[in-house]
């Protein structure tokens, strides 16, 4: 029986690429750096925004100082415009409702900075109760480190012995490795930022193309 489902945010629950790209390009342009199409920026997403900026900066400009100044320009812009084009993926709201109706606990584990993670979840899913909504926080290792999953287990009051009752759902290799590190079952989703081939490298228990398939997986574990 499934007791807890943990979701990644960007590329799993929400389509966020356009707003992330706009904020990144705003910050790059501010300092005279070349910008990137959103399709390219999509390939930079997954390891937190500092890594995103490092990937977006030109060769020879990837210093910590430059990353931090891009971050300083990015955050206020993204805080204001982070919901301009962002939207839930098809079937996500229905999936969350499906889980809620079955009293399955729901959580978010994201490498997006905490303020934005909380804001987006509250804005797009106000009717859903989450046991934990965790993003990137200072002093806490980012995914694929398993710390964020361990913190969610504590918040959900689920013991280590119950790991077979947990599903971790994400769209990237980072997510699949997080599930491996946390010793929980992974579901890779193909509607996000990464190709199926990247997910397959980590041999998750399932790779799905639709939210209905996730509902079927949950139902099969009664």
Report each predicted region and the residues it spans.
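Alpha-helical substrate-recognition element adjacent to the catalytic core
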Residues: 22, 30-60, 76, 90
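Metal-dependent phosphoesterase signature
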Residues: 55-94, 102
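Active-site neighborhood of HAD-like aspartate-dependent phosphohydrolases
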Residues: 1-43
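Asp-based, Mg2+/Mn2+-dependent phosphohydrolase catalytic module
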Residues: 1-3, 39, 100, 114, ...
